[in-house]
Amino acid sequence: MSPQTETKASVGFQAGVKDYKLTYYTPEYETKDTDILAAFRVTPQPGVPPEEAGAAVAAESSTGTWTTVWTDGLTSLDRYKGRCYHIEPVAGEDNQWICYVAYPLDLFEEGSVTNMFTSIVGNVFGFKALRALRLEDLRIPVAYSKTFQGPPHGIQVERDKLNKYGRPLLGCTIKPKLGLSAKNYGRACYECLRGGLDFTKDDENVNSQPFMRWRDRFVFCAEALYKAQAETGEIKGHYLNATAGTCEEMIKRAVFARELGVPIVMHDYITGGFTANTSLAHYCRDNGLLLHIHRAMHAVIDRQKNHGMHFRVLAKALRMSGGDHIHSGTVVGKLEGEREMTLGFVDLLRDDFIEKDRARGIFFTQDWASMPGVIPVASGGIHVWHMPALTEIFGDDSVLQFGGGTLGHPWGNAPGAAANRVALEACVQARNEGRDLAREGNEIIRAACKWSPELAAACEVWKAIKFEFEPVDTIDN
């Protein structure tokens, strides 16, 4: 009898409740290349052994429920069940374990991050037998990742579209984020772009509010970037936020952006949802638009160390769903992000093949095959003094985005943009000459100030600004 038709008629149905570990804890299991693998940080309730807790996670996120049901006999649990195949204690914690779970590929709809997350990070996170549960990492098999389009274009295609090579790209979020009229907003974009930036950006919560409707903003921003392009001879872009209350409205905004001829649109992928994001990514590939992704709401999910989901999982999900840029933290700015951990998921966004490296929080070797990469965006509380560190940490394939660090310049937006561009060019030149940006960064910036009054003014304003707080989410030691 085949596994799909196998039943338990020969032994009969036995009603009742039995321990999850009897069915779902299988330490002898050898994982398959086609399995989706998950690493969960599990904190059981007092008295619940780790084997039972890990098995409960495997069961409740796959085929199991709280009691035996007679319809179990109509399928093959051995074919479809999730399996907790390994458990290890968390260093420095008395009642916390990393439980590894393998899921058969057939549990998931092809090309659907929504379906994958509905199972793996669904109701199991409210399970009473667990005090806390966090998804630390996923291994996406090539057999599954190949069912996704992924980023609309990827890093190399974006470089070619923009004709910009050999350095990080520079951006700026327009501030104040809310309250400007469309014409004043467009003017701010123009000044930043003509001053030397590659991109300006809608803030994540700029959609279509009474003070600035989306269509007006799109028109004035398009005018700004075309004027800046004509003056500078460089291709410019503004991330037009297409996020909307419905998918239909979102696509309508993206269509209008394409009709204006702009190079890039934007989406808030967590608040907007993975289904909407994947739809927009498909539209962007079909119509030649780059897609910038903001991660608003991520910290609600990923900041606490014991419960939720690590951002590296959200980053992998975004690469599958589709986006050409995504905000990734700065390491040195105002937002959460430990250096090694941040670089770990930056590699997961950009590289084709990433080896397991627990020191950087990477639990599994990940092979993306031919899926395009995503450019990480460093944004949040950064200014010209951070430029050497950002250039050294993120490398060329990144966007360094200075909002207040551009618009807060004492002489205005265009001088603020010029200061950032001069600082970046100085750091790239110094790096290419073999200088150590980590050690000589301040010296490099001071030297550049001698021939850039805009940079000198920026350095004076932000010379004492630091954000020195310990990150909440750190690597286990």
Curated annotation (Swiss-Prot):
Quaternary data: Heterohexadecamer of 8 large chains and 8 small chains; disulfide-linked. The disulfide link is formed within the large subunit homodimers.
Protein name according to UniProt: Ribulose bisphosphate carboxylase large chain
SUPFAM superfamilies documented for this protein: RuBisCo, C-terminal domain (SSF51649), RuBisCO, large subunit, small (N-terminal) domain (SSF54966)
Gene name per UniProt: rbcL
Propeptide residue span(s): 1-2
Record's keyword terms, sorted: Acetylation, Calvin cycle, Carbon dioxide fixation, Chloroplast, Disulfide bond, Lyase, Magnesium, Metal-binding, Monooxygenase, Oxidoreductase, Photorespiration, Photosynthesis, Plastid
NCBIfam families to which the protein is assigned, alphabetical: PRK04208.1
Binding sites annotated in the UniProt record for Mg(2+): K201, D203, E204
